[in-house]
A protein has these predicted regions:
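Helix-start/capping segments and mature chain N-termini
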Residues: 1-76, 80, 98, 102-279
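Ordered, amphipathic secondary-structure segments that act as subunit-interaction surfaces
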Residues: 80-92, 99
């Protein structure tokens, strides 16, 4: 049995109902966060809440609740579901508007939905994934964690249909990120990642990995990375909230092809796992 929260009321998940006139349903007029929880502890919660706050500000959605109330409700959902490994999904839409109109009515009450998704232990050893290079066809405001994810869905469908796990997106000859992850490359033992002005989401895990790498004497370079450089990368990995460090062993559309995750990637992965288990 799972429990979710709708507008700060917790019920069994199957007993919750959202209006079909909610702007999140009609327009995708909503933002979200995904938070890793281990044994009831929400990892990097403050960072996720800060990004959620920024997303809300970017779409000019003013919450009618206190941030502390949201934080408390997230923790309640994590604890009431009592699973060792969870992803807590938080979605806030602009609210219910009975007459469909692109222009929001004034004084709408946001819809706040929080649920728990059971996930695998992030420490499960990962053999590495296969990724597909693809032109980035998403909208330009990728810094907003919007629920309007149709382009991402289509990317995942395409990758899966061709037997791959993820898509690595590029635009105008430069690397961006994955469809649901950030991108890292080891080049000459330095860790390279597309900078935030490369049309990417400011990933919480990405930021933590940069800090951890620097603290462990790994030189990190954030820059605009030409697509061609992926051919000569020593190692490639992706990062996400629920999976942490995801080694990439093959990239279709490039010369990058290896038989196993690289040592530098695995070292950083272990450092990251130590961080999340002691946070």
């Amino acid at each position: 049995m799972s429990f979710s929260s709708l507008n700060f009321e917790i019920k069994e998940s199957h007993k919750l109902f959202i209006s079909p006139f909610d702007r999140g349903f009609i327009f995708g007029d909503a933002v979200y966060e995904m938070i890793l929880c281990i044994d009831g502890r929400c990892i990097f919660l403050e960072d996720h809440l800060a990004r959620l706050k920024q997303s809300l500000a970017s779409i000019k959605l003013i919450p009618d609740f206190k941030e502390k109330n949201l934080e408390d409700e997230i923790n309640r959902i994590a604890n009431v579901n009592d699973a060792p490994f969870q992803a807590i999904y938080v979605q806030i839409s602009r609210g219910v508007q009975l007459i469909r109109n692109h222009l929001p009515e004034e004084n709408l009450s946001p819809t706040v939905f929080i649920t728990s998704i059971k996930i695998d232990d992030p420490s499960d050893r990962h053999k590495g994934i296969s990724a597909l290079l693809k032109d980035d066809e998403r909208w330009l405001k990728t810094d907003i964690k919007s629920t309007s994810l149709l382009a991402n869905v289509l990317n995942k469908i395409e990758a899966d249909s061709e037997g791959h796990d993820e898509v690595i997106l590029h635009k105008g000859g430069f690397l961006n990120e994955g469809s649901v992850s950030n991108l890292f490359l080891f080049i000459n033992d330095d860790l390279h990642t597309p900078s935030l002005d490369a049309n990417i989401l400011p990933g919480v895990t990405r930021a933590k990995l940069i800090n951890l790498a620097e603290a462990n004497n790994i030189n990190v370079i954030q820059r605009i990375i030409p697509l061609s450089e992926i051919d000569n990368a020593q190692e490639v990995f992706m990062s996400s909230t629920t999976k942490g460090v995801i080694p990439v062993v093959r990239i279709i559309g490039s010369k990058f092809d290896t038989d196993k995750p690289g040592d530098l990637t695995l070292r950083l992965r272990e450092i990251y796992l130590q961080e999340i288990y002691q946070t």
